[in-house]
């Protein structure tokens, strides 16, 4: 079976690099175009990335000799789908241009997330939200990831919401520096320090999960009906977002019921046996000092959400710690899993 031709937009950035790594020898998709800024256009990817590749494995052989172009659908006419790791300053218009040209977009940027016709897709959590794509007027459809911080949080909340109902959630994030992209946070700001503010993060963390965890009725996504309060902090960890979560339930569960709901959780990616689908989706660790980025980040090749430290909360009901890989499960990996789901469900033609 021939593979679907795809492009990577923002190919030189941190998320773009993850796309290129994860798409190497992919059974469904063939990367035929790499797109970046005018500064890189006209050069081969290997030439541009000689000193800029920041992933421990080597640049995949398929990518080295591809000539970079600017992100213009006229230059990538043969592709069916584009993965976007573009900066939000340019992503909105560029992604819309691709959709207008009939090329599907799976975006990691914030620009289209709150459009009522665009799903914030988390493949195990809300595959039913794909129904709203028919409301988009363009031939090419736009699908987005959530913010990387709340990806693991949303996965942790989904089975709890379904079984016990949720009234309110408090989040306290400790976000890795790779989440700021490259070159990222200045060394003098982050070494030996915690920065208690990340522009726009708290607003996204308080609203995106409600859309992601909502239900589709009459072709529209109805947001979940609980409240979220978030504190977001940048910490001197390279990869991995750790979030402390406290939850007030409509029907308070026991510790055993919560753990059981996490261990039993799976979704369409697991049922369909998608290449990047983690098994388990959630791993609960009993050790009192886990999860830790250094020890747990690569669980399930970076796609498994790791949870620990479940204990009673004296103000709400229960509290726990959730860890997810921000550039894999929270970005490129989630987007690729979404694309695999679209492929298997024949949304890509």
From Swiss-Prot:
Its EC number(s): 1.2.1.11
Database matches in Pfam families: Semialdhyde_dh (PF01118), Semialdhyde_dhC (PF02774)
UniProt cross-references to SUPFAM superfamilies, sorted A to Z: Glyceraldehyde-3-phosphate dehydrogenase-like, C-terminal domain, NAD(P)-binding Rossmann-fold domains
Annotated active site: 148, 241
Family recorded in the similarity comment: Belongs to the aspartate-semialdehyde dehydrogenase family.
Chain's role: Catalyzes the NADPH-dependent formation of L-aspartate-semialdehyde (L-ASA) by the reductive dephosphorylation of L-aspartyl-4-phosphate.
Identification of the protein by name: Aspartate-semialdehyde dehydrogenase
Lineage: Bacteria, Pseudomonadati, Spirochaetota, Spirochaetia, Leptospirales
């Amino acid at each position: 079976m021939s593979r679907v031709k795809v492009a990577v937009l923002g190919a030189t950035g941190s998320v773009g690099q993850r796309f290129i790594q994860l798409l190497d020898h992919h059974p469904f998709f063939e990367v035929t175009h790499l797109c970046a800024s005018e500064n890189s256009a006209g050069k081969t990817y290997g030439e541009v990335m000689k000193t800029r590749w920041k992933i421990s494995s080597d640049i995949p052989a398929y990518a080295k000799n591809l000539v970079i172009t600017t992100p213009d659908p006229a230059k990538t006419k043969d592709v069916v789908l584009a993965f976007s790791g573009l900066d939000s300053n340019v992503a909105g218009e560029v992604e819309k241009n691709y959709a207008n040209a009939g090329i599907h977009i799976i975006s990691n940027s914030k620009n289209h997330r709150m459009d009522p016709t665009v799903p914030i897709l988390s493949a195990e959590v809300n595959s039913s939200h794909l129904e709203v794509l028919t409301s988009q007027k363009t031939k090419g459809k736009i699908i987005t990831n959530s913010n990387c911080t709340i990806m693991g949080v949303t996965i942790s909340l989904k089975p709890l919401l379904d079984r016990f109902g949720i009234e309110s959630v408090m989040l306290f994030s400790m976000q890795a520096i790779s989440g700021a992209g490259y070159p990222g946070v200045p060394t003098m700001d982050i070494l030996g320090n915690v920065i208690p503010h990340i522009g726009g993060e708290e607003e996204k963390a308080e609203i995106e999960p409600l859309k992601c965890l909502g239900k589709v009725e009459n072709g529209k996504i109805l947001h979940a009906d609980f409240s979220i309060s978030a504190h977001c902090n940048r910490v001197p960890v390279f990869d991995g977002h750790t979030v402390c979560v406290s939850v007030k339930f409509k029907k308070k569960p026991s510790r055993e019921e919560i753990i059981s709901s996490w261990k039993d959780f799976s979704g369409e990616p697991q049922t369909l046996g998608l290449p990047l689908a983690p098994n388990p989706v959630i791993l609960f660790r009993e050790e009192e000092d886990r999860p830790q980025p250094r020890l747990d980040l690569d669980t399930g090749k970076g796609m498994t959400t790791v949870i620990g430290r479940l204990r009673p909360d004296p103000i709400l009901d229960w509290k726990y710690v959730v860890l997810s890989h921000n550039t894999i499960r929270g970005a490129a990996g989630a987007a690729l899993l979404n694309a695999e789901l679209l492929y298997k469900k024949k949304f890509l033609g």
